[in-house]
């Protein structure tokens, strides 16, 4: 290489050193100073990994003093290049010796990197292009936010999330029956709002006991890292900010924390985008005296744009309480309870018409009259004729029914603010079978109970009942905590025999206390060597994950998982169908929560519920109340909370004192009240609301599209290649899973989201659903998103040189492949990506400037190419420079035409969609007051903003591949 003092070179292996200057040439060695870092490097002149930096006419270069020069020509003197051109500040004709170039120059533009000899590997160019294609596919999908969560593809859940999640600042009541997945629906909406940029700051308010459950659900299912705030956390946060809520974007806290005026004031001042309130049916309200809890949520809902309330079914706690929750969502709309009741009465005609349309028979005259009256502003006679006619194609008739149903949904009821699914309207649940196993009370327990009775005269009824339900706890109080009650308790003997006779079955065992769960594991292990694992609140999230994974393993896994009451919250084990209740909780909601660990959509088998109990004890009496009074073992009991509230005192009396007459009276009264409530709920079912809530065929279509995406082998291949390029170690673990670990040769110093000790992942949804310790990889997963950002946000793959071995073409034939991106910088919240997603534009030029991209697709072209080393590639680029420069200008012309067309189409699509949606909402607002003015205002502003962003869109060259034909 011809070196001269003062020449500027760049290191091929350490480009971060910046522009170097030759400071010594002696014998066979050359020394280069890199002023940006102050470092010297000595190289062999013959094999120096250096590339000469020479700019060309038309380039802009910067001097060490900071001014720029537009190069018009260059000359050389004593091996030093002198640039001639116009001074950027004075406009004068000046010269600039290369020695005086700014040494901080970085070659960020692909063409600068190409001419500077910074040529990347061929496979990295391919991965970069695939990454840009994946980003385009994700951003342009109308299902953005629904694919990534580790949840089953349940139609009604996906429908609600799809409908609500894409709204601006949704204000909605989620009121599905227990077991239908309100938490998942809320999580899907949160995930969608975050991914689409509609929300950035989210506050979730939950009961104290559910904070950990929500934290786990958000992390494990939705890859969302929330922070739990309590008083201690708020005090700690003062070091970072006066308002602790500003220290995190995603926060979970209890209502108890916000009862304090100081904390509530801080929360009100924290600029949240979305408020989520779980167990909202516990917010008590009357017009004269709303509770403090209600006032807290009301104050927050007045300043936070989006609100999701998760609640029991509306009829579960009465209409006034239902109205109170709707009032939180829209106080202008739901301002008066009596007016609300009158309006609800008018819905009956709508429900009758909806029920008739939902069927498959001809419409009765009463339904036709109702429809004509309800949809008076629209001529519905053509649709009615189609539905009533004989010999019409079934699909045509169904389309007519669906159209009229949609008109009803749009115009009447609380369909936009309330979603309620019931088990009656959602199919796919297993049957539940109850099996009870009576056992005699051991002498040891009887003695402990007698002693306790003599000593505990001042205990409350509730304390006495709890004591009677857990005799093993009472026994330990009098012996000591290490007393081995499990050695004589007949329920333990039964459990061991049950597990031995069901060796091939997975069995979930739930007990009230963590200590009981630990003792049971010890008993199974020491007495029979049965493989079991425990799951309780004293364990960390990771420990629970490992226990759950051990239980889920088909081969070599635990036969039984023993959970405590609190420890099992939020965890589901649909792969098991046998549930052993070692004891009973006092609250019907907790009993349903236990059964709900198995009784969920996605459970493939009927559920067998097993209860070993001690005869003639509180355990038997509570079992009778649940089974005979509420039928709570074999059916869900939506009225359980109300019934417990009404009969709690009588029930506690019966549990604390054995009185058969009192028990009989309690059972009779409970049965009677249960039937009343059940009948009232059946009468209150709103067919139109149910149709709107489960989505019907539209929901199924969404699920089918998501399932097709799950099976996308192209995505799997692209992600695997992405990890290969970055340097992530991948170990096949079997069972559809891979272990990812950082390697010693990572391309980037850090890979956010990839732990040092690795993570187990799968591309298979069923595998991820059965294993809490395995992450589900989709294109929405943070590990994929981060990988895409690492590649596309760096210079990786921006330049490449390849050889095309094809004897049909003359040797030396040159092709230039250019990848452009339409750059329309806009905040994610603008939703610009819906109309103009980041789209790679490929141009393939021959040496004459003809674009061949339409004739030669990327994949077939790429397969024919071979890599060349960096040194040879640099020489080929240098030799081809006279041809390349005019080709870049030509390529930009072609790409600009494409971008202009894309922008025009995006503008047309945006105007058409938003205008149609605005017109629809404006016309509906006249007949349905549930259309909020804020939504209309948002659409008007959005159109103006998007037009501004589209006007400012620019073309950006993202990557270059130079290809030369060779016959060697």
Swiss-Prot record:
One of its GO terms (molecular function) is hydrolase activity, acting on acid anhydrides. InterPro entries: Helicase_ATP-bd, Helicase_C-like, Helicase_RapA, P-loop_NTPase, RapA_C, SNF2-like_sf, SNF2/RAD54-like_C, SNF2_N. One of its GO terms (biological process) is regulation of DNA-templated transcription. SUPFAM superfamilies: P-loop containing nucleoside triphosphate hydrolases (SSF52540). Its EC number is 3.6.4.-. Residues 491-655 form the Helicase C-terminal domain. Pfam families: Helicase_C, RapA_C, SNF2-rel_dom, Tudor_1_RapA, Tudor_RapA. A motif (DEAH box) lies at residues 278-281. Keywords: Activator, ATP-binding, DNA-binding, Helicase, Hydrolase, Nucleotide-binding, Transcription, Transcription regulation. Residues 163-332 form the Helicase ATP-binding domain. It comes from the Bacteria. It is an enzyme of class 3 (hydrolase). Gene3D superfamilies: 2.30.30.140, 2.30.30.930, 3.30.360.80, 6.10.140.1500, 6.10.140.2230, P-loop containing nucleotide triphosphate hydrolases (3.40.50.300), Tandem AAA-ATPase domain (3.40.50.10810). ATP binds at residues 176-183. SMART domains: DEXDc, HELICc. Belongs to the SNF2/RAD54 helicase family. RapA subfamily. Interacts with the RNAP. Has a higher affinity for the core RNAP than for the holoenzyme. Its ATPase activity is stimulated by binding to RNAP. Transcription regulator that activates transcription by stimulating RNA polymerase (RNAP) recycling in case of stress conditions such as supercoiled DNA or high salt concentrations. Probably acts by releasing the RNAP, when it is trapped or immobilized on tightly supercoiled DNA. Does not activate transcription on linear DNA. Probably not involved in DNA repair. This is RNA polymerase-associated protein RapA. It comes from Shewanella baltica (strain OS155 / ATCC BAA-1091).
């Amino acid at each position: 290489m011809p070196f001269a003092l003062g020449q500027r070179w760049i290191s091929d292996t350490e480009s971060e050193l910046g522009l170097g200057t030759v400071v010594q040439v002696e014998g066979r060695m050359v020394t280069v100073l890199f002023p940006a870092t102050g470092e010297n490097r000595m190289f062999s002149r013959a094999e120096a990994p250096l590339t000469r930096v020479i700019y060309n006419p038309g380039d802009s270069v910067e001097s060490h003093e900071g001014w720029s020069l537009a190069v018009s020509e260059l000359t050389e003197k004593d091996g030093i290049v002198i640039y001639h051109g116009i001074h950027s500040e004075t406009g004068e004709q000046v010269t600039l010796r290369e020695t005086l170039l700014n040494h901080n120059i970085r070659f960020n533009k692909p063409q600068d990197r190409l001419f500077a000899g910074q040529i990347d590997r061929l496979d990295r160019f391919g991965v970069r292009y695939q990454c840009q294609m994946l980003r385009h596919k994700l951003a342009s999908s109308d299902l953005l936010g629904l694919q990534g969560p580790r949840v089953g593809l349940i139609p009604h859940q996906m429908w609600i999330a799809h409908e609500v999640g894409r709204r601006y600042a949704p204000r909605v009541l989620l009121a599905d029956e227990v077991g239908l997945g309100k938490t998942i629906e809320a999580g899907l909406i949160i995930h969608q709002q975050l991914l689409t940029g509609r929300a950035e700051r989210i506050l979730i308010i939950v009961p104290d006991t559910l904070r950990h459950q929500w934290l786990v659900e958000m992390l494990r299912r939705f890859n969302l890292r929330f922070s739990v705030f309590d008083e201690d956390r708020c005090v700690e946060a003062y070091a970072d900010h006066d308002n602790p809520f500003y220290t995190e974007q995603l926060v979970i806290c209890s209502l108890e924390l916000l009862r304090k005026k100081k904390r509530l004031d801080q929360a009100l001042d924290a600029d949240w985008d979305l408020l989520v309130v779980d167990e909202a049916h516990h917010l008590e309200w009357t017009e004269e005296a709303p509770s403090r809890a209600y006032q807290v949520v009301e104050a927050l809902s007045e300043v936070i744009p989006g609100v999701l309330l998760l609640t029991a079914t509306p009829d579960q706690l009465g209409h006034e309480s239902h109205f109170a929750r709707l009032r939180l969502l829209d106080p202008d709309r739901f301002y008066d309870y009596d007016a609300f009741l009158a309006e609800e009465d008018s819905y009956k005609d709508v429900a009758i018409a909806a029920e008739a349309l939902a069927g498959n028979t001809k419409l009765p005259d009463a339904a036709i009259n109702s429809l004509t009256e309800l949809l008076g502003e629209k001529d519905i006679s053509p649709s009615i004729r189609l539905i009533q006619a004989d010999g019409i194609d079934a699909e045509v008739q169904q389309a007519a029914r669906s159209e009229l149903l949609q008109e009803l949904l749009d115009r009447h009821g609380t369909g936009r603010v309330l979603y309620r699914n019931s088990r009656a309207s959602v199919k796919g649940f297993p049957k539940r079978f109850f099996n009870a196993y009576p056992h005699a009370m051991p002498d040891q327990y009887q003695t402990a109970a007698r002693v306790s009775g003599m000593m505990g005269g001042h205990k409350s009824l509730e304390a006495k009942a709890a004591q009677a339900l857990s005799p093993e706890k009472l026994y330990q109080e009098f012996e000591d905590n290490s007393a081995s009650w499990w050695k004589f308790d007949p329920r333990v003997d039964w459990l061991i025999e049950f597990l031995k006779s069901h060796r091939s079955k997975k069995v979930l065992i739930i007990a009230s206390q963590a200590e009981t769960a630990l003792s049971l594991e010890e008993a199974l292990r020491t007495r029979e060597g049965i493989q079991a694992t425990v799951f309780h609140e004293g364990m960390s999230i990771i420990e629970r994950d490992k226990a759950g994974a051990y239980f889920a393993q088909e081969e070599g896994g635990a036969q039984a998982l023993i959970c405590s009451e609190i420890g099992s919250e939020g965890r589901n084990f649909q792969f098991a169908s046998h549930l052993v209740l070692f004891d009973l909780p006092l609250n019907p909601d907790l009993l349903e929560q236990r059964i709900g660990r198995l009784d969920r959509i996605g459970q493939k088998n009927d559920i067998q519920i097993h209860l070993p109990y001690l005869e003639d004890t509180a355990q038997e009496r509570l079992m009778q109340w649940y089974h005979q009074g509420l039928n709570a073992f074999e059916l869900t009991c939506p009225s359980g909370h109300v019934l417990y509230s009404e009969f709690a005192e009588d029930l506690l009396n019966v549990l604390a004192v054995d009185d058969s007459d009192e028990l009989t009276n309690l059972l009779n009264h409970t049965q009677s009240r249960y039937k009343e409530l059940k009948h009232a709920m059946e009468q209150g079912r709103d067919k139109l609301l149910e149709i709107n809530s489960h989505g019907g065929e539209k929901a199924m279509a969404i699920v089918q599209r998501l399932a097709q995406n799950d099976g996308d082998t192209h995505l799997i291949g692209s992600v695997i290649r992405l990890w290969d390029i970055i340097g992530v170690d991948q170990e096949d673990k079997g069972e559809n899973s891979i272990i990812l670990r950082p390697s010693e040769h990572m391309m980037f110093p850090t890979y956010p989201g990839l732990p040092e000790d690795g993570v187990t992942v799968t591309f298979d949804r069923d595998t991820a659903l059965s294993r809490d310790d395995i992450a589900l990889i989709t294109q929405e997963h943070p590990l994929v998103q981060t990988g895409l950002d690492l590649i596309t946000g760096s210079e990786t793959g921006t330049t490449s040189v390849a050889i095309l071995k094809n004897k049909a073409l003359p040797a030396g034939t040159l092709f230039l492949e250019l990848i452009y991106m339409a750059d329309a910088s806009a905040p994610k919240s603008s939703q610009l990506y819906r109309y103009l997603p980041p789209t790679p534009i490929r141009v393939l030029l021959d040496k004459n400037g003809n674009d061949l991209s339409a004739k030669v697709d990327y994949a077939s072209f790429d397969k024919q190419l071979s890599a060349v080393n960096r040194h040879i590639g640099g020489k080929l680029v240098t030799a081809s420079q006279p041809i390349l420069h005019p080709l870049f200008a030509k390529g930009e012309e072609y790409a600009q035409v494409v971008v202009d067309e894309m922008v025009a189409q995006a503008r047309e699509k945006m105007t058409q969609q938003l205008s149609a949606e605005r017109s629809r909402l404006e016309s509906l607002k006249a007949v349905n007051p549930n259309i909020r003015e804020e939504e209309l205002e948002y659409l008007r502003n959005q159109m103006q903003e998007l037009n501004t962003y589209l006007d400012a869109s620019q073309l950006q060259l993202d990557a270059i591949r130079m290809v030369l034909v060779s016959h060697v």
